[in-house]
Regions:
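Active-site microenvironment for binding and transforming phosphate-containing groups
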Residues: 1-252
Length: 252
């Protein structure tokens, strides 16, 4: 992926009419500890600052503010289709997709993994918020199913998330993934600082899920929101902090 201005853009082979970005923490108006491009309205930041940050984001990608489909994310597996009728409603879901040009699917993260999907014909795009619970619960599977195209025609981009050197989890997390798929064991090692804990690679876990579905083209990954405090918000590092946004949309 490449950095242009205050956003990351995927290095992938999606059709030209597909656009995707992931914001960094730079370029906004929020003060500490949300400095500065906080796009989350649920983190106790000044609502006017969040509104201005969202306006700046929309302007930078040449979309109207009310055409960005913000979600009420709950670490679940619900998927919503975004249309002109609901794009401004902040629907309770952890993934969205759309076939409508000029409407952006958006997910907010600050360590969780944003996963973007697009089909090879440029007819449908989607985005999922993958914390470990939603990822393990099947949010990617639900999104791929809802997009209703052959999975082998999809490609995925993995945005910035907590890296494998910083993502320490309890044994119940490892067990939950392995119960679903024994191959998931390869995404964990026993180097956790606390006894009985493991280090997890959320990029590898998501890639495994995608590959099993038939999505073989997966790009991105390799970043760590915890380690790169200049670029990224991190809940695990800072506690109260802002949120980045990852968006995907179709142009006309």
């Amino acid at each position: 992926m490449t950095i242009e201005g205050n956003a990351l853009k995927p290095d992938w082979s999606a059709p030209n009419r597909v656009r995707a970005i992931s914001t960094t923490r730079a370029g906004g108006v929020s003060g500490r500890p949300w400095n500065s491009l906080n796009l989350g309205s649920h983190v106790e930041d000044d609502p006017e600052h969040v509104q201005e940050n969202r306006r700046r984001l929309a302007e930078s990608i040449r979309l109207d503010c009310d055409r960005i489909g913000w979600l009420n994310q709950v670490h679940g597996t619900e998927v919503v289709e975004l249309t002109a009728n609901n794009v401004g409603q902040t629907v309770k879901a952890d993934a969205s997709y759309t076939r409508h040009p000029g409407i952006a699917c958006a997910v907010l993260t600050a360590d969780c993994l944003p996963v973007v999907l697009a089909d090879s014909e440029g007819t449908v795009v989607g985005a999922a918020h993958c914390g470990w619970r939603s990822l393990c619960g099947g949010v990617i599977e639900n999104l791929v199913g809802a997009m209703a195209v052959p999975p082998e025609t999809l490609q995925a981009w993995l945005g910035p998330a907590i890296g494998p050197e910083r993502f320490e989890v309890g044994p119940e997390v490892r067990e939950a993934f392995i119960k679903h798929d024994p191959e998931a064991a390869q995404a964990f090692n026993d180097d956790g600082a606390r006894p009985g804990h493991f280090m997890a690679d959320i990029y590898a876990l998501a890639t495994l899920r995608l590959n099993h579905l038939g999505v073989s083209v997966v790009t991105g990954g390799g970043l760590c929101t915890v380690q790169d405090s200049d670029l990224f918000f991190s809940y695990r590092r800072d506690g109260q902090t802002g949120r980045m946004a990852t968006l995907v949309w179709l142009t006309s």
